[in-house]
């Protein structure tokens, strides 16, 4: 198992910002189509984080043309170019799955106040 731990340590990214469920993030993902490569931006609310170490993932939800879209990203994936935290949210839960049922202004996450 020590060899696997060493391999995991090499794959962990160091430039990941501190974010939690309720925060609005902008994820820049490298998309390769044939011989061309481009960067796609996915911005939404983090509704869950799970896993530990290299296997850690986070789920981002956004509304696109009145349809909810969720995407699960591996945190240490090489296809993720960078992650930006747009706003910090104030929530009392670790998993925000209840937001899936809410519509309109009720689906908003309250912004955390700066002290």
Swiss-Prot record:
Keywords: Ribonucleoprotein, Ribosomal protein. Coiled coil: none annotated. Pfam families: Ribosomal_L19. GO terms for cellular component: cytosolic large ribosomal subunit. It comes from Tropheryma whipplei (strain Twist). One of its GO terms (biological process) is translation. This protein is located at the 30S-50S ribosomal subunit interface and may play a role in the structure and function of the aminoacyl-tRNA binding site. This is Large ribosomal subunit protein bL19. Gene3D superfamilies: 2.30.30.790. Belongs to the bacterial ribosomal protein bL19 family. InterPro entries: Ribosomal_bL19, Ribosomal_bL19_CS, Ribosomal_bL19_sf, Translation_prot_SH3-like_sf. GO terms for molecular function: structural constituent of ribosome. NCBIfam families: rplS_bact.
């Amino acid at each position: 198992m020590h060899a696997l731990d060493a391999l995991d340590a090499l794959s962990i990214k160091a430039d990941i910002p501190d974010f939690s469920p309720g925060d609005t993030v902008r994820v820049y993902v490298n998309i390769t189509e044939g011989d061309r490569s481009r960067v796609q931006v996915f911005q939404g609310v983090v509704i869950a984080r799970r896993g530990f170490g290299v296997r850690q993932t986070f789920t981002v939800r956004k509304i696109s043309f009145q349809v909810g879209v969720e995407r699960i990203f591996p945190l240490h994936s090489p296809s993720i170019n960078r992650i930006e935290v747009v706003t910090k949210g104030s929530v009392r839960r670790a998993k925000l799955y209840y937001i899936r049922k809410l519509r309109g202004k009720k689906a908003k996450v309250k912004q955390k106040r700066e002290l």
